[in-house]
Amino acid sequence: MTRLTLALDAMGGDFGPCVTVPAALQALASNPALNLLLVGDPAAITPLLAKVDSDLLSRLEVVPAESVIASDARPSQAIRASRGTSMRIALELIKDGRAQACVSAGNTGALMGLAKLLIKPLEGIERPALVSVLPHQQHGKTVVLDLGANVDCDSTMLVQFAVMGSVMAEEVLELKNPRVALLNIGEEESKGLSTIREAAAQLKEAPSINYIGYLEGNDLLTGKTDVMVCDGFVGNVTLKTVEGVVRMFLSLLKSPASGPGQKQKRSWWLKWLGRLLQKRLSKRFGHLNPDQYNGACLLGLRGTVIKSHGAANQRAFAVAIEQAMQTVRRQLPDRIAARLEAVLPKSD
């Protein structure tokens, strides 16, 4: 199996090395062909490696970084002061050819800006988009973008997102002629912002895109479309709302609510029935757990950059690492570039 080397921004996210280092070790243990470059403060990282097996340590290198970009820093300021930060160094490792992908749970705006500066967008792409693959109720998956990289999007950007999402659905989900929809406040053609209506008009005329029209937020997990396109503001709010609802639902399955108005004593058969239902429902809906699809790819770059949730736990960050590996092995940037050349106009 071909060896892979990934760079991890070990200091990014809400929990920094406390999550990223154990997740890195988990990924190394599961993937013998994986090497990792942990970028960050050695004083914070090294103690977490004290009891690690020598085989894992042989495939791990700590790359020192002087500082970290704060999660609440303004992207423009963060980029100007980014030299020496763990995020920038991790991206530079891709640029210099030492790593094939980067994973960070840090500041989204800064990651977007630095990735565009250092890795460069593909020909014909104005701005990369954050994209993730979400499960739906038909036991399939839906490509959703943009999830927060671009708050303001014009119609041209939405069309580019549609093309990239369609290519990803074909290459990653192996779908033929994937359905593409625009997320809107209604399915009527007159609904929505002018940018959405203009994008719809362009997509209708694009022979390479199987555009099916507008869909609403409640259609996201129904399987009505293979690709859902929206601007980054709407996408981020939608994603986090869905994740919040799913987490609440799964927590209720594990521990049914009880309160002053509810009887605490139940017969043995009711307790048995409750546990049985919890187990079956948890198994039935467990695939919706947001931790299992953490990690959004910055689609449209010449390299692979994965953005993890800032609040990701060890399991979720390990999933983001796995996604980076899959993206590299599928050569997604190269395959998308080849398709984009045929369907998008080249930039000046």
UniProtKB/Swiss-Prot annotation:
Which pathway? Lipid metabolism; phospholipid metabolism
Keyword Cytoplasm on entry:
yes
Q: Which GO terms describe its biological process?
A: fatty acid biosynthetic process; phospholipid biosynthetic process
Tell me the keywords, alphabetical order: Cytoplasm, Lipid biosynthesis, Lipid metabolism, Phospholipid biosynthesis, Phospholipid metabolism, Transferase
User: In the Enzyme Commission scheme, what number(s) does this protein have?
Assistant: 2.3.1.274
Catalytic reaction list: a fatty acyl-[ACP] + phosphate = an acyl phosphate + holo-[ACP]
Q: Which domain of life is it from?
A: Bacteria
- One GO MF term attached to the UniProt entry: phosphate:acyl-[acyl carrier protein] acyltransferase activity
Q: Which Gene Ontology CC terms are recorded?
A: cytoplasm
User: Where the protein is mainly located, per its record?
Assistant: cytoplasm
Q: Which family does it belong to?
A: Belongs to the PlsX family.
Q: How does it assemble?
A: Homodimer. Probably interacts with PlsY.
Q: What is this protein called?
A: Phosphate acyltransferase
The organism of origin for this protein: Pectobacterium carotovorum subsp. carotovorum (strain PC1)
Gene (UniProt): plsX
